[in-house]
Amino acid sequence: MDPGRSHIETIIESSTHKFILFDEPTEETIPYFKDLMKKNSCINIVRCCEINYDASLFEGVKIHELCFKDGNVPPKDIIERWLEILKQAFIENGKQKTTVGIHCIAGLGRTPLLVCIALIEDGMKPLQAVEFVRSKRKNAINSPQIKFLKEYKASKKAGCKIM
């Protein structure tokens, strides 16, 4: 493991999903992350950054590309694709809680932002989602992203789950 990286992985759970948030894998850390995905029955990884590693090294895991600019908020089409990935993963897992891996470069901006969106869709209030994620992953989510989340409206009726 790279000792300079302080946020290796964080697990956050909602009623329908378990999220594994992590830094971008490197040649040295891919074996660790492959093992982590296997131990958590994770067959979906969402990558929010540019391609910097060989995705084929994660055999048996589907890599979804949801890239958007670091420090920014996701465009509407990225949010829609994120929610569709979560819905599909839930269905493929027989409507049982399913595990989704998600990463950007440091795992502190884009990654926790998308997880907050999922938590809001799952019925959590926006600032509750931010506080919950930050309680698990220190320094996550910047001020413009928090402003975006405060104004974010779940696509479903209040209290409905991602499904």
UniProtKB/Swiss-Prot annotation:
GO cellular component: cytoplasm; membrane; nucleus
Top-level taxon of origin: Eukaryota
Record propeptide residues: 161-163
Disulfide bonds: 49-104
Name of this protein: Probable protein tyrosine phosphatase type IVA B
Subcellular location: Membrane
Membrane topology annotation: Lipid-anchor
Modification sites for Cysteine methyl ester: 160
Protein family per UniProt: Belongs to the protein-tyrosine phosphatase family.
Catalytic-site annotation from UniProt: 70 (proton donor), 104 (phosphocysteine intermediate)
Domain Tyrosine-protein phosphatase: 10-161
S-farnesyl cysteine lipid sites: 160
Alphabetically ordered keywords of this record: Disulfide bond, Hydrolase, Lipoprotein, Membrane, Methylation, Prenylation, Protein phosphatase
